[in-house]
Amino acid sequence: EILACTTLGLEHHKTVKWIIEVAALNAKQIIQLSALIKNLVISNFKEEHYASVFVKSSTGFYKTKNNLPNGATRETIILMLENASPLPVKAAGGVRTLEEAIAMIRLGVKKIGTSSAKSIANNALSQSDY
């Protein structure tokens, strides 16, 4: 399914984002899924297409026990970057401040998914629970 859906997206000149919902996974599973997506893309597509296939950390909707972070934590993003490269990583879920956004960019993410863009741009604290 990963191969078929990636092919369909790329054939239509779209960006493909594979959401692995890291809050539902352990470190080993994050590594395995990131590597699986990377290996399928590298084995089946030209290097020029790599930049159009993202591995994304979260939808932002996954409910965790005890309100633990549900997406882009430093630890999960590092695992994704180390195992998805050369595919780009999109940090999503829980990036709510300018400091968090800068930290993700410094780690190497290529995109950030956030409902707090205005607050981040204004360097203000987000009021969003989304």
Give the ranges of each region predicted by the language model.
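Glycine-rich phosphate-binding active-site loops on the catalytic face of alpha/beta enzymes
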Residues: 43-67, 93-130
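Conserved anion-binding
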Residues: 1-64
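Amphipathic, non-transmembrane alpha-helical secondary structure
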Residues: 3, 7, 31-35, 74, ...
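Catalytic cores of alpha/beta
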Residues: 25-36, 79-86, 95-111
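Conserved hydrophobic beta-strand within the GNAT/NAT acetyltransferase core sheet
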Residues: 18, 89-93
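Short, exposed beta-strand "edge-strand" segments with a Pro/Gly-rich flavor and a Y/T-containing core
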Residues: 24, 68-72, 96
